[in-house]
Amino acid sequence: MLGEINPDKSMEKKEYKTELKRLENELGSLQLRLRSVGLPVVIVFEGWGASGKGTHISRLVNPLDPRYFDVRTTGKLNEEKQMRPFLWSYWTYLPPKGQIVIMDKSWHRLILPGIREHWGLSNMEIHGFYYDVNAFERQLYDAGYLIIKLFLHISKDEQASRFKALAKEATTAWRLNERDLKQNEDYEHNLRQFEKLLRLTSTEENPWHVIEANDKRYASVKIMKTISERIKERLKEIENPKPPVKIQASATVLEKTLSKVHPDETISDEEYRLQLGFYQERMKMLGNKMFAKRRSAVIVYEGWDAAGKGGNIKRLTSEVDPRCYAVVPIGPPRPQEHSRHYLWRFMVKMPKDGHLTIFDRSWYGRVLVERIENLTPPHIWQRAYREINEMEQHLVTHGVVILKFWLHIDKDEQLRRFEDRKKDPSKAHKITEEDWRNREKWDEYEEAVDELLFRTHTSHAPWIIVESNHKKYARIKVLQTVTDALDDAMR
């Protein structure tokens, strides 16, 4: 791919000025149009060292309204990024609808030549990274993002010349490092590695665009042309939408899981007191051990309304150092959340190494309430099962322990708790009209829960059904399950 492309293409100054002015006007107009239709755009620059990424980004943003674009410097893996799954920072950079984000380096950084050797990545880890980045890009495309990936290609001699020029000036010499020089020294080897990366991460929906960048004038014009053409293509698709592709229903007969669970398990008061103290002390010790070993965990609470999630979370965390955990309650998305990919608001809350995050409701709302209440079209919530599994796999690959609890009560117990809340002034705020409406759709929710258990229960991110008619039993079961899993993970 790269070996067949001559990076020496050039452009005369007069032609450059004419084209630059035309393209600047066009990009300014396109920015207004993409804002009006709510098209989020991610422009990714990648390429050889000294290929001119900074220069070309500066020229690109010149005609744009600075209120509606953001430039992100993404290259260096600082401590914060190293303590998160490697795609975490790129999730945090995603623009809202109608805005542009420009990244000076791509999410492919860890698998670039030189960098992967620096981190000592195995072939299996590299294979996992390819899978993760392709899944990430597909998820964004499916959600309506336009991703424009630009690879700036220069020759070995041109790179050596630019390195020499940088080294001469005190104001730019700091930008050079041993890895840059090694890249030029091993140019042919790195060329083959870059070709492999482009081949394995270029898809019909999210292709790479190679920019011949020996001549900066030619490169700037091609970059602007490419971006302009891609935006116009996507705007045309938005203005003339195709009907959504229907996802074929699986022929597999889904198992009726919840109906087989009897939520009446109990524990005596004396046994509860003994086990509560034991497991809370164990949880405290494991929380400290997690911090020392830099292991993180995500615990998801889902369940029927009034199943006891809040009290369960309180008992789980009561002895844990509050600096090491966070509880994230999830409600309807706020405007800034609704304007991004639906997983964005969850990814930005994922714990850094050594910490625990507990989600009181979660990303599974997409295949529960959004499905039942017709808040999301079927073709969108149906693809969420795959997206959720991919996200959880990415977290686990980083070393995150994931446990997902469904707190299960029967319909009679829910009614009793609803009535108790209605009668008790101190609990009346816990019961809403929405709770009663959800109760009327019990059978629909049960069917949706059975499907999510079937499609998203994995060995690395398992679902645990917690019999919760008796709250004390449920609290001990969760404490025991969590402490056992954390203990196993840190052996």
Regions found by a protein language model. Give the residues of each.
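Glycine-rich phosphate-binding loop of ATP-dependent small-molecule kinases
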Residues: 1-491
